[in-house]
Amino acid sequence: DAGGTTAQASIALIQQVWPYVTDEVAAQILAGTAFTDFAGFDPDVHGLGVIDIDQALLPIGELRMPLDGREGTRAINGEIAGVNFGSFDNVTAVDSAGRGFDININSMHTPDIQNNWYDVALTDSITRMDYNFDYVYSEGMLNYSPTDESGNFTMGLRDIKLAKGWYLQGQYTTLADRNPWFHMSGMWGTINSSETIETVVTHVKDKFMFNMGNMHTTTNFDSGLVTNVTPIDSVWGEISWRNEGLRLAVGSMPYVVKGDIDVRLPSTIDSQGIVHHDTFNFEIENQFATYSSVNYANSFRNINYTLGAYNNTLGFYQAQVKLNLAF
């Protein structure tokens, strides 16, 4: 149908759903859906034309995430991983006409993140942050990796003697553009770098070695929906037995015990069209897992070789063979 009465009723329906939409904006929305390509169309007679009210109740243009008040919007894109949102899924977005719509962001967040520590048991290093680097050098008590092209860097001291059979290791690590515990992009925010201070207490007795480590990670980031990231604390432990070239080990992979983020999300739009946000707190978490490994190193004539195998309770298995030919 067409005409003034139908148009006014349609405007009233739009304003019933979105009270803050003005008559002018509502008329523009309806005009965008009106069908006028029919014989004899006369705006003085038919008004806006044949209105598709169902179409008028759908979003116009791209849905975007509103900022505080009516100060602007941001594109709905990106993801966040390593954070447990629980059952939280719906937020408010706005279309190009400024109308609010509930959207589901379930596909844009996940508590799972690729584990950074799978290769931990296939090396002989004591500190765990080493496993974010391809090469780490040890010279005396110094443990380090030169700054790479991305700006990643690690350096620390090892084998600081505390008492008979007890040692302390300390490591400082900078990772560019990432945090080892969670990831975010797009509307959530951007991680510029993370800094981790790791301390490890080691006890050696006969052929056994016990390591207990703690990592304290801070995050430098540009905020988006994420407005705050607290320091992240994680712990790990390992016990190993070595006899000449054979090394057996069991342990726990680094596990987050403390750390969370604040996320400011649009929740409602009031009758004046003002967007209201709520701040939610979500925990950074990973799955607790244990591992076991075996490594054997020996030589035959002028060939040095190493055999290694590793598995963890996350279902990951790995084996490797290294051969070095000495001339």
Model features per residue range: what roles?
Residues 308-314:
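A short, acidic, flexible beta-alpha connecting loop/helix-capping segment that sits on the rim
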Residues 97, 104-216:
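Outer membrane beta-barrel translocator domains of Type V secretion systems
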Residues 16-111, 115:
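C-terminal subdomain of the subtilisin-like protease fold in secreted/lumenal serine endopeptidases
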Residues 243-245, 298, 315-327:
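Outer-membrane beta-barrel "beta-signal"
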Residues 1-12, 16, 20:
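Extracellular S/T/G-rich loop segment that most often corresponds to the catalytic His/Ser-adjacent loop
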Residues 2-6, 45, 181:
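Substrate-binding/access-modulating region of protease and related hydrolase catalytic domains
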Residues 152, 168-171, 175-191, 196-202, ...:
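Outer membrane beta-barrel transmembrane domains
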